[in-house]
């Protein structure tokens, strides 16, 4: 797996298979999530940007950080399950009120082995 990009030592792909590898064991669902809330500073900047129009960079950055954290937590959970990869990885989001959002990362934790050519 040294030639494959990993997160916390876990291969993570959105596809059901990993080229060059075969699934030898399914460990279950790996998951990781985080809830992020806005704060007054971000809200004020967002309001000002909203008046002008365009991207609200403060929220974009906050959500990017949240996705990375959810992804990292999912990889750590996969490792706890004894997996070395996650296939069929996805993100889900939900609004938890006016100023909070949950980012949830999930996929199938598996053990893969390199296929000999």
Curated annotation (Swiss-Prot):
<dbReference type="InterPro" id="IPR035439">
    <property type="entry name" value="UPF0145_dom_sf"/>
</dbReference>
<protein>
    <recommendedName>
        <fullName>UPF0145 protein PH1682</fullName>
    </recommendedName>
</protein>
<comment type="similarity">
    <text>Belongs to the UPF0145 family.</text>
</comment>
<dbReference type="Pfam" id="PF01906">
    <property type="entry name" value="YbjQ_1"/>
</dbReference>
<dbReference type="InterPro" id="IPR002765">
    <property type="entry name" value="UPF0145_YbjQ-like"/>
</dbReference>
